[in-house]
UniProtKB/Swiss-Prot annotation:
It comes from the Bacteria. The keyword Membrane does not apply. Keywords: Cytoplasm, Methyltransferase, Nucleotide biosynthesis, Transferase. This is Thymidylate synthase. Homodimer. DUMP binds at R26, R131, R132, R171, S172, A173, D174, N182, H212, I213, Y214. Belongs to the thymidylate synthase family. Bacterial-type ThyA subfamily. The gene is thyA. One of its GO terms (biological process) is dTMP biosynthetic process. One of its GO terms (cellular component) is cytosol. One of its GO terms (molecular function) is thymidylate synthase activity. The active site is at C151.
Length: 269
């Protein structure tokens, strides 16, 4: 008997369709929404890139590298053919103190800045049992200056039995467009950090707050749910860079990504 392919993401889409409340939202689009859901992905079972539609891995990888640069301008993304942040950028390409700035340069009261990512790597090497291996993008003082408040706001690393796991808290979860990117992005980051600190990959745990499907995505979601999934692809590294900040797109080797065609949908801005 063939073992069914797990479909936690697609199962959550069905949950939102069946149980979601109708809510208004900042964009004026309207959503079906549930509150407080969790998905778990064992990274030993493959790389969690959704197969029931094509997900653009290049954009995911370059966005993560852009975060790790501590960048707040879309110029570097555009140079590499990635346009996913263009809708929020100003005429100079600026977004304000968004994810990368908070990850790499969190402002301290004394005028210095904290590199949260470097702290994560250092703590994993020095004290892997710490319960404080955390990165936050939710800087309350800076939110008014951000083009978009952080949706994926807070993540924590955890080490047990020689394996590195990561849990993300996503306060606002656009299930059709955003969440497939977020799952793959943080799974990739977990694999990168695990390689850097000499641990095996464990789980990626995704926790969502306001988990929603936009009203203008319902048709696309139903089309996606009519498709049978393929087995998860694999992700390996072409080399081991000197640090977590030295990875290049060419270092990520995605193998065996079978997928259904892409499904187009409008972004709620």
């Amino acid at each position: 008997m063939t073992t069914p392919i797990p479909t936690p993401y697609e199962d959550l889409l069905r949950d939102v369709l069946a149980n979601g409340s109708h809510k208004s939202d900042r964009t004026g689009t309207g959503t079906r929404s549930v509150f407080g859901r969790q998905l778990r992905f064992d990274l030993a079972d493959g790389f969690p890139l959704i197969t029931t539609k094509r997900v653009h891995f290049k954009s995911i990888a370059y966005e993560l590298l852009w975060f790790l640069r501590g960048d707040s301008n879309v110029g570097w993304l555009r140079e590499n053919g990635v346009s996913i942040w263009d809708e929020w950028a100003d005429e100079r390409g600026e977004l304000g103190p968004v994810y990368g700035v908070q990850w790499r340069s969190w402002p301290s009261p004394d005028g210095t800045h904290i590199d949260q990512i470097q702290q994560v790597v250092d703590t994993l090497r020095r004290d892997p049992d710490s319960r404080r291996i955390i990165v936050s993008a939710w800087n309350v003082a800076d939110i008014p200056d951000m083009a978009l408040a952080p949706c994926h706001a807070f993540f924590q690393f955890y080490v047990a039995d020689g394996k590195l796991s990561c849990q993300l808290y996503q306060r606002s979860a656009d299930m059709f467009l955003g969440v497939p990117f977020n799952i793959a992005s943080y799974a990739l980051l977990t694999l990168m950090v695990a390689q850097q600190v000499g641990l095996e990959p464990g789980e990626f745990v995704w926790t969502g707050g306001d988990v929603h499907i936009y009203d203008n995505h319902i048709e696309q979601v139903n089309e996606q749910l009519s498709r049978n999934p393929f087995p998860a692809p694999a992700l390996r590294f072409a080399r081991r860079p000197e640090s977590v900040f030295d990875y290049r797109y060419e270092d990520f080797v995605l193998e065996g990504y079978r997928h259904h065609p892409a499904i187009r949908a409008a972004v709620a801005v």
